[in-house]
Amino acid sequence: MSNRKYFGTDGIRGRVGDAPITPDFVLKLGWAAGKVLARHGSRKIIIGKDTRISGYMLESALEAGLAAAGLSASFTGPMPTPAVAYLTRTFRAEAGIVISASHNPFYDNGIKFFSIDGTKLPDEVEEAIEAEMEKEITCVDSSELGKASRIVDAAGRYIEFCKGTFPNELSLNELKIVVDCANGATYHIAPNVLRELGANVIAIGCEPNGVNINEEVGATDVRALQARVIAEKADLGIALDGDGDRVIMVDHEGNKVDGDQIMYIIAREGLRQGQLRGGAVGTLMSNMGLELALKQLGIPFARAKVGDRYVLEKLQEKGWRIGAENSGHVILLDKTTTGDGIVAGLQVLAAMVRNHMSLHDLCSGMKMFPQILVNVRYAAGSGDPLENDNVKAVTAEVEAALGNRGRVLLRKSGTEPLIRVMVEGEDEAQVTEFAHRIADAVKAV
């Protein structure tokens, strides 16, 4: 188990202006990354960002650090995270860097690296970068300094890639779609992908101003999308998050369709088309209704820890191709190397068109179990509530009452002193009562 100082499970992230998301830190990060990556070769680095105002500052700092280490940088401008992974592969770049805090508010930002094959940097490379950051910055000889350039048609290349994941024999001509781009990195891409495939597109969340990313729009807040779908009498809505690696959908009645349901639709269609290899990977938070629906289809299902990184690891371990979190991270390894909201959405649209079915009807084969989540704050020095005898006893009582038609999950937050209590089962009133019973036991510790 590595003991890294800066890199978390999803790169480096924080509030802009507070360590580590400061200009001096990011400059040194660029230099350290440049020193380490230069050992592997002298190819350029691709840098993409979302629409946060801080992206300008941070990409300049990164580029300066890389140049001092002798590596050149190519900027994509605002670009979805999965697009940077794709461009890194196609340009055979030494690495890709994304400046984004995904679904977080504008005042946060982060930095994530992709390796030459469009996957996460190996742990040992991240550790080498951290080790380099302990040293003083040195500059290569002036004749060896890196340069900066801009990739002229980055968006066009990625649009064509996305369209290429949609079956050639199908068209979206019959569909009216509302797409919500979260005022984020997909604002100039997702509407064009859908239009070029023939859809009648109404775009919202496509007016980024640097500070409105994810603000009451996008995959984390679909209320505006739900209202617009109903007002426009659209066939469906598609919501992406700030960096385009998540997708949540809305059916023609305004019902939310989450990552579990999206994976169910894609897995079932893959089975029908004879293209599903193995099973599907969800997380500890995936709805039990997904597990049961896949079981009825004969599709194996495995749960990973929460986090798209762990979903990907489980897929690689099993040799399977499809995984998802209910938050909307959908990973389709036969199409791409990372979660891609646009590509996942297109596979659902293909299932709709091919089967002449609405999104609502495609979801009907999966019954979502009521799932109640209660967050309980505890005193940091009061011991581990999960080891408390009374908490264990109450949890065991609830599990016995639910039997094999429900689940209980207690887990600690990774960032604050919270216990997350999740209970799911067939009866919402019962599940709610059980969740609060366990939460009360945790509070009493």
UniProtKB/Swiss-Prot annotation:
<dbReference type="Pfam" id="PF02879">
    <property type="entry name" value="PGM_PMM_II"/>
</dbReference>
<dbReference type="InterPro" id="IPR016055">
    <property type="entry name" value="A-D-PHexomutase_a/b/a-I/II/III"/>
</dbReference>
<dbReference type="InterPro" id="IPR005846">
    <property type="entry name" value="A-D-PHexomutase_a/b/a-III"/>
</dbReference>
<protein>
    <recommendedName>
        <fullName>Phosphoglucosamine mutase</fullName>
        <ecNumber>5.4.2.10</ecNumber>
    </recommendedName>
</protein>
<dbReference type="InterPro" id="IPR006352">
    <property type="entry name" value="GlmM_bact"/>
</dbReference>
<comment type="function">
    <text>Catalyzes the conversion of glucosamine-6-phosphate to glucosamine-1-phosphate.</text>
</comment>
<dbReference type="InterPro" id="IPR005843">
    <property type="entry name" value="A-D-PHexomutase_C"/>
</dbReference>
<dbReference type="Pfam" id="PF00408">
    <property type="entry name" value="PGM_PMM_IV"/>
</dbReference>
<dbReference type="GO" id="GO:0008966">
    <property type="term" value="F:phosphoglucosamine mutase activity"/>
</dbReference>
<dbReference type="Pfam" id="PF02880">
    <property type="entry name" value="PGM_PMM_III"/>
</dbReference>
<keyword id="KW-0479">Metal-binding</keyword>
<feature type="active site" description="Phosphoserine intermediate">
    <location>
        <position position="102"/>
    </location>
</feature>
<dbReference type="GO" id="GO:0006048">
    <property type="term" value="P:UDP-N-acetylglucosamine biosynthetic process"/>
</dbReference>
<dbReference type="InterPro" id="IPR005841">
    <property type="entry name" value="Alpha-D-phosphohexomutase_SF"/>
</dbReference>
<dbReference type="GO" id="GO:0005975">
    <property type="term" value="P:carbohydrate metabolic process"/>
</dbReference>
<feature type="binding site" description="via phosphate group">
    <location>
        <position position="102"/>
    </location>
    <ligand>
        <name>Mg(2+)</name>
    </ligand>
</feature>
<dbReference type="InterPro" id="IPR005845">
    <property type="entry name" value="A-D-PHexomutase_a/b/a-II"/>
</dbReference>
<dbReference type="InterPro" id="IPR050060">
    <property type="entry name" value="Phosphoglucosamine_mutase"/>
</dbReference>
<dbReference type="Pfam" id="PF02878">
    <property type="entry name" value="PGM_PMM_I"/>
</dbReference>
<dbReference type="GO" id="GO:0000287">
    <property type="term" value="F:magnesium ion binding"/>
</dbReference>
<comment type="similarity">
    <text>Belongs to the phosphohexose mutase family.</text>
</comment>
<keyword id="KW-0597">Phosphoprotein</keyword>
<feature type="binding site">
    <location>
        <position position="245"/>
    </location>
    <ligand>
        <name>Mg(2+)</name>
    </ligand>
</feature>
<feature type="binding site">
    <location>
        <position position="241"/>
    </location>
    <ligand>
        <name>Mg(2+)</name>
    </ligand>
</feature>
<dbReference type="GO" id="GO:0005829">
    <property type="term" value="C:cytosol"/>
</dbReference>
<dbReference type="GO" id="GO:0009252">
    <property type="term" value="P:peptidoglycan biosynthetic process"/>
</dbReference>
<dbReference type="GO" id="GO:0004615">
    <property type="term" value="F:phosphomannomutase activity"/>
</dbReference>
<dbReference type="InterPro" id="IPR036900">
    <property type="entry name" value="A-D-PHexomutase_C_sf"/>
</dbReference>
<feature type="binding site">
    <location>
        <position position="243"/>
    </location>
    <ligand>
        <name>Mg(2+)</name>
    </ligand>
</feature>
<feature type="modified residue" description="Phosphoserine">
    <location>
        <position position="102"/>
    </location>
</feature>
<dbReference type="InterPro" id="IPR016066">
    <property type="entry name" value="A-D-PHexomutase_CS"/>
</dbReference>
<keyword id="KW-0413">Isomerase</keyword>
<dbReference type="InterPro" id="IPR005844">
    <property type="entry name" value="A-D-PHexomutase_a/b/a-I"/>
</dbReference>
<keyword id="KW-0460">Magnesium</keyword>
